[in-house]
Amino acid sequence: MSKLVLATGNQGKVKEMASLLADFGFDVVAQSDFNVSSVAETGTTFIENAIIKARHAAKETGLPAIADDSGLEVDFLQGAPGIYSARFAGEDATDQQNLEKLLADMEGVPAEQRTARFHCVLVMMRHENDPTPLVCHGSWEGSILTQAQGENGFGYDPVFWVPEDQCASAQLESPRKKELSHRGKALQKLFAALKDA
């Protein structure tokens, strides 16, 4: 099994990504196990931020690193929260505060205007100076509910309506979420790229 550093401090992402990557034969180690310092996400796109995080983790650990930059894009909000999804309600906002801000911003918006999607960009760098990092993107179409539903998942999962299963993302069991989610789709692409490499 290949060891891989997961460049995130988000424990929800660590749990979900470790489970997904284990399916592909990777032994995932969280960057917190190496005391990797935080790095400013100064990019203006999901791709730029994922590269910044993967390069930083690879540099500090000496191991291959994978970084995820993901977020929710709401059409009514002209794509917000986007790359600012984790800090939509402020720099140190909790998942609950971000979710509450989203619901407040969407209050009174009719169902047909509540379309949204999750995006996930995964970047894998074999080392800090990798000139050809693997970059994979996945998206997941849905809409924004008027109130939270479900106990599973993290972030915006309780308000993200999944049309395929007629429930909130937070109501999905883990195997089904892996199959449908933006992160699961991006990881499938990453695994296919690794097999071809």
From Swiss-Prot:
GO terms for biological process: nucleotide metabolic process; purine nucleoside triphosphate catabolic process. It catalyses: XTP + H2O = XMP + diphosphate + H(+); dITP + H2O = dIMP + diphosphate + H(+); ITP + H2O = IMP + diphosphate + H(+). Binds 1 Mg(2+) ion per subunit. One of its GO terms (cellular component) is cytosol. Its cofactor is Mg(2+). Keywords: Hydrolase, Magnesium, Metal-binding, Nucleotide metabolism, Nucleotide-binding. Its EC number is 3.6.1.66. The active site is at residue 69. Pyrophosphatase that catalyzes the hydrolysis of nucleoside triphosphates to their monophosphate derivatives, with a high preference for the non-canonical purine nucleotides XTP (xanthosine triphosphate), dITP (deoxyinosine triphosphate) and ITP. Seems to function as a house-cleaning enzyme that removes non-canonical purine nucleotides from the nucleotide pool, thus preventing their incorporation into DNA/RNA and avoiding chromosomal lesions. PANTHER family: INOSINE TRIPHOSPHATE PYROPHOSPHATASE, INOSINE TRIPHOSPHATE PYROPHOSPHATASE/HAM1 PROTEIN. Homodimer. Belongs to the HAM1 NTPase family. HAMAP family: Non_canon_purine_NTPase (MF_01405). This is dITP/XTP pyrophosphatase. The lineage of its organism: Bacteria, Pseudomonadati, Pseudomonadota, Gammaproteobacteria, Vibrionales.
